[in-house]
Amino acid sequence: MSIKLFDSEQKVMEVLWREGDLHAGQIAEILKDEIGWNRNTTYTVIKKCIEKGAIERQEPKFFCKALISREEVQKAETKELIDKLFGGSRLQFFSAFLSDDKLSEDEISELKDLVNKLK
């Protein structure tokens, strides 16, 4: 399932991924403390996530359950970025991504292991 999340929707999902299933009121309290959102803003964003199929609403008390994983969103967002900026070329993406950063020996070793697993 590929769902495009806006930044505000991503914030709600991050709370659910980090904390697990919660009542909407609990999400509102967390986001009030973390980023200053009021209750109405949080409920509006939760409802948008429900409409997109990212969250399931369960009763009683507006219980929210994430229907998509962080990994699914990361994959979809990464694919969109690669398609948009690199013409779909993962090689160009990795080349650009790795050219500016100094990688540690451990990071280089982990990348080599990942590539070897693909063979």
For each predicted feature, which ranges?
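Short, cationic-aromatic polyanion-contact patches
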Residues: 3-8, 60-79
